[in-house]
Amino acid sequence: SRDNRTKVLAEIATQYERAIVFCRTKHGSDRLAGNLESMGINTCVIHGNRSQAQREKALEQFRRGKATVMVATDVAARGIHIDAVPVVVHFDMPEDPKDYIHRSGRTGRAGMKGTVISLIDKSMRRTTTSLCRGMKFDVIYDEPNFNLSEPAKPVRPGEIGAVVATLLKVESD
């Protein structure tokens, strides 16, 4: 469920200096950012309903570390260059494999290593496998307590490895 994915995302956010999180819709981006803020995680939001000034302010907050999580739609997947982003999280999977590649390309820039995590629940597994099949990813389905220090290995040298987290169960407090 979306609530379970939000809880896991909050945990991921605490393990990285900063993260870019992609959502499918503008409303979903705003809602997720609000939920993360209520959990004590500083966020900024970029999507098509934001003015250029609002987008620039959000980028500046993220670059300076005032916001540790940037929640965005695919607007941020192309043309935005931010160095040293250690992790990209696909909160909502895109429909097009090219969008997955562009989103994922926001991490691991300038010769640095990066991690890509896709948060899915059990019902999304078949669609995700189909999406990733053509991208030559080594897809690893893992539980929410996955070890982020062990990234997936590329299928072939020079390709991207992806970790897809399957949210089967999240313990409640």
Which residue ranges define each predicted feature?
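Conserved helicase RecA-like core
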Residues: 1-173
